[in-house]
């Protein structure tokens, strides 16, 4: 692949094999849930409880460029956020890089169906997913729709794969 071509060209071609080896580990532990399901909410609560090892939950304040970023629900290197708390404010790469120093696992709840009206949220979400992927942080999401069905103002099919690969 020539880097002089746009990245969009890289993701247009489909794999011509029967097994997508990048998603094999998805069967081992579920990490995507639908927001409107009561069962999903219970499972996310269980994930947080198990991985926090029932240690005390705290809020931690990170200061980045004279801005405060509150990491709510932090316990035993797992953090839990509502989507708007982590992507809704003016967050950037520096915020997310500071966050990953504190965690090995991240739960993001209530990820909306993206459309053409919230492109800033989508950019922050894509940036966060890339940082989590690059740093091997395990991700759990609850979304309005299946992650592959989330609408987008951008061609973000590779983001779906990266989100799956954060296992």
Model-derived features: positions:
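Conserved small/polar residues in nucleotide/adenosyl-binding loops
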Residues: 6-14, 159-166
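Interdomain motor-coupling "hinge/lid" segment immediately C-terminal to the ATP-binding subdomain
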Residues: 9-66
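Short glycine-/polar-rich loops that comprise or flank the Walker A/P-loop
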Residues: 12-13, 103-104, 135-137
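Hydrophobic/aromatic beta-strand patches that form the interior of the parallel beta-sheet core
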Residues: 13-17, 81, 140
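A generic structural signal for short, non-catalytic loop/turn and secondary-structure boundary residues
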Residues: 55-57, 64, 74-76, 101, ...
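Conserved helicase/translocase motor-coupling segment
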Residues: 67-115, 119-123
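Terminal-proximal interaction/regulatory segments of ATP-powered molecular machines
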Residues: 109-162
């Amino acid at each position: 692949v020539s880097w002089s071509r746009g990245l969009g060209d890289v993701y247009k071609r489909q794999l011509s094999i029967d097994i997508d080896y990048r998603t094999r580990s998805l069967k081992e532990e579920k990490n995507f849930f639908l927001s409107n399901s009561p069962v999903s909410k219970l499972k996310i609560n269980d994930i947080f409880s198990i991985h926090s090892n029932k240690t005390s939950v705290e809020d931690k304040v990170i200061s980045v460029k004279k801005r405060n970023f509150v990491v709510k629900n932090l316990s035993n290197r797992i953090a839990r956020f509502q989507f708007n708390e982590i992507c809704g404010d003016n967050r950037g790469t520096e915020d997310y890089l500071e966050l990953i120093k504190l965690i090995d696992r991240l739960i993001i709840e209530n990820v909306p169906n993206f459309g053409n009206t919230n492109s800033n949220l989508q950019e922050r979400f894509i940036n966060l997913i890339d940082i989590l992927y690059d740093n091997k942080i395990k991700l759990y999401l609850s979304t309005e729709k299946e992650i592959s069905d989330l609408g987008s103002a951008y061609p973000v099919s590779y983001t779906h794969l990266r989100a799956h690969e954060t296992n």
